[in-house]
Amino acid sequence: MQKKKCTAIVLAAGQGRRMGTKTQKQYLEIIGKPVLCYSLEVFQESEIIDEIILVVGKGQETYCKKEIVEKYQIQKVKKIVTGGEERYHSVWNGLKEVSKDGYVFIHDGARPFIDQEMIRRVYEEVVQHKACVADMPVKDTIKIVDTSEFAEETPDRSRVWLVQTPQAFENNLIKNAYEILLEKEEYSVTDDAMVVEKILGKKVKLVRGSYENIKITTPEDLDIAGVFAKIQKK
């Protein structure tokens, strides 16, 4: 069977307010290289990914093209598009550039430590199940709390997983789900799997990600990322 086209949508339009820096988190450096470049380079080197759609904040298009795409020779970037007000608006702006046939891998540009094996695992599952996400089992006990921050419930830890990216879908499936989402604007969603689950009622397959596949959100995350990057360079 001939391989279908695979597109990576890399989201780099977030404001990163929790980082507390003037520079947005995706452009902060980890041992001399911008956070965003790490995942772009992995997709660039992947035999599975055919093209990249890069979604950036308004006014950052030229900077990203010159200082990221051209400087680091990310030749698979087909187009740089402007993000929207919320994450799901940014995803939709990227999806509009994706063809009807094939698969799309939606990834947070603030997650620098994906690898080729993870992409391969996600690809194998999306071909079989049409919708899958990278996840990892939680290590700590989780508490459900009330509005006053008192514990209400302790869920079974074996059934609680940390959701990561990439999240991969058959193109028509995810585009259809997002079209309905944008048309109704009545759902609260925090990731792409939720869009498919809530709107289409489709089950999403979980795929092992990595505990190193952290999202850079706070200054502490950047410190941890520096350690991971140094280990990878050895």
Residues covered by each model-derived region:
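Conserved beta-loop-beta/alpha segment of the NTase-like Rossmann-fold superfamily
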Residues: 79, 85-145, 164
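Short, flexible, basic/aromatic active-site loop/helix in glycosyltransferases
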Residues: 144-169
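Conserved alpha/beta core of the MobA/IspD/sugar-nucleotide pyrophosphorylase nucleotidyltransferase superfamily
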Residues: 2, 161-234
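Short, well-ordered secondary-structure micro-motifs
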Residues: 64-67, 91-92, 116-117, 143-149, ...
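Hydrophobic packing residues within well-ordered alpha-helices of enzyme cores
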Residues: 19, 64-68, 122, 225
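Conserved N-terminal catalytic core of the sugar/cofactor nucleotidyltransferase
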Residues: 37-101, 184-185
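N-terminal glycine-rich phosphate-binding loop and ensuing alpha1 helix
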Residues: 3-61
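Residue-level signal for inorganic ion chemistry
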Residues: 10, 36, 94, 108, ...
